[in-house]
């Protein structure tokens, strides 16, 4: 009898091999939700792999698992009623040794439910469920890497994930790192709980499509990252629903070392975001952002509709590496976007020395739900080194759109509606050049408030625009700070002025003069754009005393008077680091030091430039929290 059973088993396995299908129950999986089924499912995966590919079938039932490793040419197919549920015991997971350099390596996670590295032609399909078991377990949010990821695919090619539900993650739900040619279709990601429980992280990937999917997450729903020096590019997201999102619905960053290019998002619905944004486009670690398109998006009950940010956190992604330049943010289009019940204004905020450029917003309608008091026009904070988020700039001096340090900005067919009691203008622009507003219409609830406020602006055209309300003035400018303003065919109410100049407000600073006790400032030298400067054609010796041990960032306030980018060099303790300066106004060059120092230790730096034109005014030191996980 025993011999007959063995023969029957071998016949089943043989038949599966012929068909390229491997049923996990044949390999011993119990599917009772109690027995740890990891090794049985892994045996099926390994068998399919050794047979040069096949489908691992997971029938209905609940399978408790630790870590599964997907391999080349294997499809993991979850049949209807099948659930893979993560074990609550750390010992059931493998502490995977990952090969690819990334900020997320070890720091963010070391345990995974489903993992693959360097695999090709892999798939996770079906109508079943992958359940992280994270709502009841793994509630300690720090350190983050003790909470298992659900799915992490690293350096994989030709990946398909279709139809499955990914529920209750303990950490990130689904992380794609350095993957190429990925197709995600018809999935559902839902999770709750505390801590970083992202939905889908598309990290340093190329050629990724996401379609027909639903998201409801504690943290960001779909976030594109660049946690190493690889560009995240050629991403297309369409026909997705976002509901009850604890972070942002669609986001780039904050990790942005490699940068972002060629991203299209279309035909999406976003609802119920209490604290963050429907769309957040941010790069703060040196990487570029270029050629981005969002179109046909509807939002309801969001904190902020959109937030576009260039910052200079400049955090390294691995030991021995540092950010050596600040790249551009440009060529971003927002088209056919409709928003109701927005709590905060949208904003586009660059740097004084590097403006965000080529932004086009067309066919945009926003209805604000909350009236706020505002900071003065010249008192909006900089926070250039901080963790970026739309909420960092609350109480902005505009209820619908605030822009600072932007050039080549085009608004066309834009409608803005204010909340009851709102006193702010609809739009405020500061340090914006080459601006075109056409067909802009907005409510202005306060009779004495302008529809648009301009300061420090140049080459601005406002055409065929009007306020819905009979306020006193359409456009208000700060005296002697706006050049080249053209008003064309705007529609005015009786007794309404088209343009009025008011007294200019003085700016305390045009960059973040952050607090630090470790600083060196040039006291004698030439005056360049209101700052005392040293010409770096002659090297500058600087000695600084450290106040505590930690990761240090040497921040040099520099400008480049040359017509070409110039290389800034620092030398200390036998170490040389370069930074490329490609801006012409005063701005910070933040260089993370490759060596740590003890408290009270004095460090001698030599600052110089290879070519002509670099000027320096300040040398500050700030401490970085490189252990913080985003």
Q: Can you say where each PLM-predicted feature lies in the sequence?
A:
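Short, surface-exposed beta-strand/strand-loop-strand elements in extracellular ectodomains
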Residues: 564-575
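Glycan-recognition and processing domains
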Residues: 501-545, 557, 616-630
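Sec-dependent N-terminal signal peptides
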Residues: 6-8
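Extended extracellular/luminal ectodomain segments enriched in beta-structured repeat modules
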Residues: 546-554, 600
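Extracellular carbohydrate recognition and processing domains
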Residues: 574-599
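Short beta-strand-plus-loop segments that form exposed binding edges in beta-rich domains
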Residues: 605-613
């Amino acid at each position: 009898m025993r011999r007959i059973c063995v023969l029957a088993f071998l016949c089943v396995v043989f038949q599966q091999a012929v068909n390229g299908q491997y049923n996990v129950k044949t390999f011993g999986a119990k599917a009772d939700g109690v027995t740890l089924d990891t090794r049985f499912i892994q045996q099926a995966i390994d068998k399919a792999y050794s047979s040069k590919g096949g489908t691992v079938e997971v029938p209905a039932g609940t399978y408790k698992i630790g870590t599964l490793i997907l391999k080349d040419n294997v499809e993991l197919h979850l049949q209807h009623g099948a659930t893979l549920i993560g074990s609550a015991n750390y010992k059931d997971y493998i502490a995977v040794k990952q090969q690819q350099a990334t900020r997320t390596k070890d720091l963010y996670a070391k345990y995974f439910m489903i993992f693959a590295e360097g695999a090709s032609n892999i798939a996770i399909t079906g109508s079943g469920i992958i359940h992280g078991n994270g709502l009841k377990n793994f509630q300690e949010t720090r350190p983050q890497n003790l909470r298992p990821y659900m799915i992490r695919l690293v350096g994989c090619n030709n990946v398909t994930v279709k139809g499955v539900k990914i529920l209750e993650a303990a950490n990130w739900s689904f992380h794609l790192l350095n993957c190429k040619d990925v197709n995600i279709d018809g999935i559902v990601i839902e999770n709750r709980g505390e801590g970083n429980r992202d939905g889908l992280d598309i990290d340093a990937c190329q050629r990724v499509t996401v379609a027909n999917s639903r998201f409801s997450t504690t943290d960001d729903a779909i976030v594109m990252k660049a946690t190493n020096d690889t560009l995240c590019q050629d991403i297309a997201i369409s026909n997705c629903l976002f509901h009850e999102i604890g972070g942002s619905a669609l986001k780039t960053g904050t990790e942005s070392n490699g940068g972002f290019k060629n991203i299209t998002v279309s035909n999406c619905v976003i609802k119920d975001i209490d604290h963050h944004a429907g769309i957040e486009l941010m790069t703060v670690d040196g990487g570029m952002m270029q050629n981005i398109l969002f179109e046909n998006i509807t939002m309801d009950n969001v904190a902020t509709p959109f937030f576009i940010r260039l910052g200079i956190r400049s955090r390294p992604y691995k030991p021995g590496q540092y950010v050596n330049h600040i790249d551009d943010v440009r060529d971003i289009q927002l088209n056919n976007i409709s928003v109701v019940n927005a709590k905060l204004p949208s904003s586009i905020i660059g740097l004084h020395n590097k403006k965000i450029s080529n932004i086009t917003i067309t066919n945009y309608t926003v209805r604000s739900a909350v009236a706020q008091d505002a900071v003065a026009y010249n008192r909006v904070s900089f926070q250039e080194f901080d963790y970026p988020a739309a909420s960092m700039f609350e109480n902005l001096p505009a209820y619908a759109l605030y822009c600072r340090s932007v050039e080549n900005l085009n608004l066309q067919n834009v409608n803005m509606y204010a909340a009851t009691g709102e006193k702010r203008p609809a739009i405020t622009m500061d340090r914006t050049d080459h601006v075109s507003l056409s067909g802009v219409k907005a409510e202005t609830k306060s009779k004495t408030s302008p529809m648009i406020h301009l300061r420090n602006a140049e080459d601005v055209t406002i055409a065929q625009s009007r306020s819905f309300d009979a306020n006193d003035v359409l456009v208000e400018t700060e005296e002697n700070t706006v050049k080249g303003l053209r008003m064309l065919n705007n529609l005015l109410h009786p007794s309404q002025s088209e343009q009025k100049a008011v007294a200019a407000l003085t700016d305390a600073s045009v960059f973040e003069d952050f607090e630090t006790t470790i600083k060196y400032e040039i006291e004698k030298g030439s005056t360049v754009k209101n700052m005392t400067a040293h010409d770096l054609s002659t090297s500058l010796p600087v000695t600084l005393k450290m106040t505590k041990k930690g990761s240090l960032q040497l921040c040099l306030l520099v400008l480049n008077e040359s017509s070409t980018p110039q290389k800034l060099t620092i030398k200390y303790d036998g170490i040389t680091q370069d930074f490329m300066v490609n801006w012409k106004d005063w701005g910070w060059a933040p260089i993370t030091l490759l060596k740590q120092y003890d408290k009270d230790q004095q460090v001698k730096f030599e600052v110089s430039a290879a070519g002509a034109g670099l000027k320096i005014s300040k040398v500050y030191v700030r401490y970085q929290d490189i252990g913080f996980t985003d």
